[in-house]
A protein has these predicted regions:
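Conserved class I S-adenosyl-L-methionine
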Residues: 2-60, 62-71
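Class I SAM-dependent methyltransferase SAM/SAH-binding core
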Residues: 79-122
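A short SAM/SAH-binding and catalytic strip from SAM-dependent methyltransferases
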Residues: 133-148
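Conserved beta-strand signature within the Rossmann-like core of class I S-adenosyl-L-methionine
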Residues: 159-169
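Short, glycine-/aromatic-enriched active-site segment of Class I SAM-dependent methyltransferases
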Residues: 167-186
Length: 294
């Protein structure tokens, strides 16, 4: 006998559940937002998160990739340096400009090709051919109302493997340690669960592992820190700003690496918090459907 809970799990339309979740959320950041932040993202070295992603993706030498939502090239550049051909796509023109600087810096013009493309674009009209790359990846970049359509676009483009990461806990922009300390509840969305279940419904066999990404937030003054962390209070918790200021004042310490390049390439601030913020990402990989199976 099948339990009610099992039946509900199997019968749930997870893409419709995802759409409802997106409708209740703050609107996704648009290209203009990422354009404004592009200069803070410069791929000059391979960071621990990128190394962990690449280890799990297991892209073979000589294989071609689609890097969807590539940003400034945190993965496209390392893959290019390994000799892989990469089609690096993003919906932010300025991000692609910064990527172009990285391509020229590393002399990767023959290996990494930037392309302006959004998840919700018509990929056929944009020239994205079926089974045109060996591996399709989307690292921390799936921001779309229709998750199933996005996953199917990756599936249709890749011949051998698809790899994505989605948040496994709360928002990557929220420091749970701080929020707990100042009495603000945090809703953990577990975005990856939706993708996993959609893929299962599509007949794929997704595999899941986790990447713990430590983040060290730095700032130069208390006021700067408050302004930066205040983003976590948007959407109904703005009245907790005094508690946030008090917390930061008691937990800010000198940063021994002040002035050195941070994760996004810009100089680190003079102060940091006395704890490391950890973000958990779910890495999901699957074998795409072949053209003869469609």
């Amino acid at each position: 006998m099948v339990s009610d809970s099992h039946a509900t799990l199997v019968e749930t339309n997870w893409n419709e559940e995802w759409k409802a979740l997106q409708a209740a959320r703050h609107p996704a950041d648009d290209p203009a937002f990422w354009d404004s932040r592009a200069r803070h993202f410069q791929a000059r070295e391979t960071h621990p998160y990128a190394r962990a992603f690449m280890e799990r993706a297991a892209v073979a030498p000589g294989e071609s990739l689609l890097d969807m939502g590539c940003g400034a090239g945190s993965l496209a550049i390392p893959y290019g340096l390994r000799g892989n051909h990469v089609l690096a796509c993003d919906f932010s023109p300025h991000m692609l400009d910064v990527l172009g600087e990285g391509i020229r810096f590393h002399h990767l013009e023959a290996l990494v090709t930037p392309k302006l493309l959004a998840w919700d674009d018509d990929w056929d009209a944009a020239g994205m051919q079926p089974k045109s790359v060996d591996v399709a990846i989307a690292s921390r970049s799936i921001a779309t109302h229709d998750l199933a359509a996005a996953l199917l676009k990756l599936d249709r483009t890749a011949r051998r493997r698809c790899c994505i990461t989605l948040i496994a806990t709360g928002s990557p922009r929220v420091d749970r340690h701080i929020m707990d300390a100042i009495g603000v509840s945090v809703t953990e969305s577990h975005d990856y669960v939706y993708a996993f279940n959609i893929l299962v419904r599509l007949g794929r066999h997704p595999e899941v592992s986790y990447i713990i990404s430590p983040r060290r937030d730095t700032f130069n003054t208390l006021d700067e820190g408050v302004a930066d962390f205040a983003r976590m209070l948007e959407g109904g918790n703005e009245e907790r700003l005094p508690e946030l200021r008090t917390y930061l004042a008691h937990h800010m310490v000198e940063n021994p690496e002040a002035g050195m390049p941070g994760e996004k390439g810009r100089p680190q601030g003079a102060y940091m918090l006395d704890h490391v913020r950890e973000v958990c990402w779910a890495f999901i990989a699957w074998k795409p459907q072949g053209l003869d199976e469609e």
